[in-house]
Regions:
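Short Lys/Arg-enriched helix C-cap and helix-to-coil transition segments
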Residues: 134-150
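Short, basic interhelical loop/turn and adjoining N-cap
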Residues: 108-125
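Residues in the recognition helix of alpha-helical DNA-binding motifs
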Residues: 126, 130
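Positively charged, polyanion-binding regions of nucleic-acid-associated proteins
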Residues: 77-98
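Short, charged amphipathic recognition helices of the HTH superfamily
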Residues: 93-113, 134
């Protein structure tokens, strides 16, 4: 779901807006590329690989500063997931305040954000976790969707 949302929102390769928090974080995380050595451990890749257009900063030119360590990749992925949840939260709260949050509206949000059908169940699970967290804070969202509508 994250891959679909990112490609739909920022394109492929990912090109973030000039003064975005993503570019600021990338600027902080990139390091000078190290020459590869024969004994290095090969990194295991999970999911789909995305290319990212690095910001061009006067002190950190992308030609030299384009290495993300394993820890930096984890931090950046966590940040992207956080922005996905913020986008979903904004939609849920806006739609719920109008009183029209339904399974169809959640499906429509997924469709409009380029999330494939195979990943929509994951988005629903995120919604239910978010709903539970909001209820713990006293914000009530619509009840669970009827099982007859879930597919």
């Amino acid at each position: 779901y994250l891959f679909d949302w990112l490609v739909n929102k920022y394109g492929n390769p990912l090109r973030f807006p000039a003064r975005s928090p993503h570019n600021d974080l990338l600027h902080a995380l990139v390091a000078v590329a190290r020459p590869k050595q024969g004994g290095e451990e090969v990194e295991q890749k999970r999911g789909m690989t995305l290319k990212v257009v690095l910001p061009n900063r006067s002190r950190h030119k992308p030609e030299h500063y384009h290495h993300l360590s394993k820890a930096a990749k984890i931090i950046f992925t966590r940040d992207l997931k956080r922005f996905f949840r913020l986008d979903l939260t904004a939609f849920v709260l806006n739609t719920a305040s109008k009183g029209c949050l339904t399974l169809e509206s959640l499906e429509q949000w997924c469709k409009s954000h380029g999330i494939r059908i195979t990943h929509r169940d994951a988005v629903k699970r995120i919604y239910y976790r978010m709903k539970k967290q909001l209820e713990e804070q006293g914000i009530l969202l619509p009840p669970k969707f009827p099982k007859s509508l879930q597919s």
